[in-house]
């Protein structure tokens, strides 16, 4: 068994800065050549501390960025132009991908379509709200204005 310090997050093994014990072949053939880990040494404790400090700083920065984007998203109304009939019924429905594209087109930053939660199917023009998960701890509510395309 080889004792290693992870330098990157490895699925099923741990996060950067974790000290793990793995089989020699896994360490020699996968983790070490790809730079995912360093061999454990007595001076490795300092490396572990610096890796964990860098990870904490990145996590703090990502939370702050997500909070800033959430504030920007909540303060603006996003307009979606969709093909619709004369009665206001849409030809299809508004999907999370449509909302993500409209947010990016409005200049409010890129969001992942998988993080958009629509409360119900949007099948007619009008005003709606959608929830967006920007981070593990941060979410925003977007006001949507669905209008008929000309």
Curated annotation (Swiss-Prot):
PROSITE patterns: RIBOSOMAL_L9
InterPro entries assigned to the protein according to its UniProt record, in alphabetical order: Ribosomal_bL9 (IPR000244), Ribosomal_bL9/RNase_H1_N (IPR009027), Ribosomal_bL9_bac/chp (IPR020594), Ribosomal_bL9_C (IPR020069), Ribosomal_bL9_C_sf (IPR036791), Ribosomal_bL9_N (IPR020070), Ribosomal_bL9_N_sf (IPR036935)
A GO CC annotation given for this chain: ribosome
Record flagged with keyword Ribonucleoprotein: yes
Alphabetized UniProt keyword annotations: Ribonucleoprotein, Ribosomal protein, RNA-binding, rRNA-binding
GO molecular function, one term: rRNA binding
Superkingdom per UniProt: Bacteria
GO annotation terms (biological process): translation
Family that this chain belongs to: Belongs to the bacterial ribosomal protein bL9 family.
Function: Binds to the 23S rRNA.
PANTHER family given in the database record: 50S RIBOSOMAL PROTEIN L9
HAMAP family assigned to the protein according to its UniProt record, in alphabetical order: Ribosomal_bL9
Record protein name field: Large ribosomal subunit protein bL9
């Amino acid at each position: 068994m080889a004792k290693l310090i992870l330098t990157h997050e490895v699925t099923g093994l741990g996060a950067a800065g974790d000290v793990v014990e793995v089989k020699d072949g896994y360490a020699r053939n996968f983790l070490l050549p790809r730079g995912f880990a360093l061999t454990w040494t007595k001076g490795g404790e300092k490396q572990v501390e610096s890796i964990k400090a860098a990870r904490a700083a990145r996590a703090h920065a990502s939370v702050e960025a997500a909070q800033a984007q959430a504030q920007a998203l909540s303060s603006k109304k996003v307009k979606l132009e969709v093909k619709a009939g004369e009665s206001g019924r849409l030809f299809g429905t508004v999907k999370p991908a449509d909302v993500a594209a409209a947010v990016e087109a409005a200049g409010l930053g890129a969001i992942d379509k998988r993080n958009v939660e629509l409360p119900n199917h949007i099948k007619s023009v009008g005003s709606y709200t959608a929830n967006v998960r920007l981070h593990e701890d941060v979410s925003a509510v977007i006001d949507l204005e669905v209008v008929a395309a000309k």
